[in-house]
């Protein structure tokens, strides 16, 4: 079994999301023209949690959507290797993003490739006024010039490690762990 070190427990995740919610509100001077878009899979659940906290803090309902970046990735995955048909899950943005301040939400920022794909997918939906990035964990090792605007926790890692965020909505656990790939 691979060695796992817990770097964020359930309480730390909750605190980080609350802080990020306040930062989003402060930087955008409220919630006017603000929208949250979660990157599948865990980014969707984190966007929903940020939405809930912003609603509690400001009393304003911010639109929330989700984006599937499957067709925009440079490491496309397939549901069937024989047909080479991509595994597409669908995008759900039930509001106009034109002129909005969109906050893309993801669980872990690593190379920046997922975020680049998400921005490409978002631009195919519309033209936001601004795109910001919120992540629960930033582990470094960027390959592209991408930086998160809102970070729950910076988690430095080596090339042999990966950060895995587990949410009860998907994983039946609530934490962030560093996993050593060599153990």
UniProtKB/Swiss-Prot annotation:
Q: Assembly and partners?
A: Homodimer and homohexamer; in equilibrium.
Q: Which family does it belong to?
A: Belongs to the purine/pyrimidine phosphoribosyltransferase family. PyrR subfamily.
Organism encoding this protein? Listeria welshimeri serovar 6b (strain ATCC 35897 / DSM 20650 / CCUG 15529 / CIP 8149 / NCTC 11857 / SLCC 5334 / V8)
Q: What is the name attached to this protein's record?
A: Bifunctional protein PyrR
Q: Top-level EC class, please?
A: transferase
Q: Which UniProt keywords apply?
A: Glycosyltransferase, RNA-binding, Transcription, Transcription regulation, Transcription termination, Transferase
Function field: Regulates transcriptional attenuation of the pyrimidine nucleotide (pyr) operon by binding in a uridine-dependent manner to specific sites on pyr mRNA. This disrupts an antiterminator hairpin in the RNA and favors formation of a downstream transcription terminator, leading to a reduced expression of downstream genes.
An example Gene Ontology biological process: DNA-templated transcription termination
Query: Which GO terms of the molecular function aspect are on file?
Result: RNA binding; uracil phosphoribosyltransferase activity
**UniProt xrefs under Pfam families:** Pribosyltran
Q: Where is this motif: PRPP-binding?
A: 102-114
- Catalytic reaction annotation: UMP + diphosphate = 5-phospho-alpha-D-ribose 1-diphosphate + uracil
EC annotation from Swiss-Prot or TrEMBL: 2.4.2.9
């Amino acid at each position: 079994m691979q060695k796992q070190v817990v770097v964020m427990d359930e309480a730390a995740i909750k605190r980080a999301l609350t802080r990020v919610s306040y930062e989003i509100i402060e930087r955008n001077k409220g919630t006017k023209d603000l929208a949250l878009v979660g990157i599948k899979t865990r980014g969707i659940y984190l966007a929903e949690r940020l939405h809930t906290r912003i609603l509690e803090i400001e009393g304003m309902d911010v639109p929330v959507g989700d984006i599937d970046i499957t067709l925009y990735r440079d490491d496309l995955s397939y549901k069937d290797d024989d047909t080479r048909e991509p595994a597409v899950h669908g995008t759900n943005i039930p509001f106009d993003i034109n002129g909005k301040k969109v906050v893309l939400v993801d669980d872990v920022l690593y190379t920046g490739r997922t975020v680049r794909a998400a921005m490409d997918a978002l631009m195919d939906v519309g033209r936001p006024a601004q795109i910001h990035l919120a992540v629960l964990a930033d582990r470094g090792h960027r390959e592209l010039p991408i930086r998160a605007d809102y970070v729950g926790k910076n988690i430095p890692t080596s090339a042999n490690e990966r950060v895995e965020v587990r949410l009860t909505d998907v994983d039946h656990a609530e934490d962030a762990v560093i996993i050593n790939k060599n153990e």
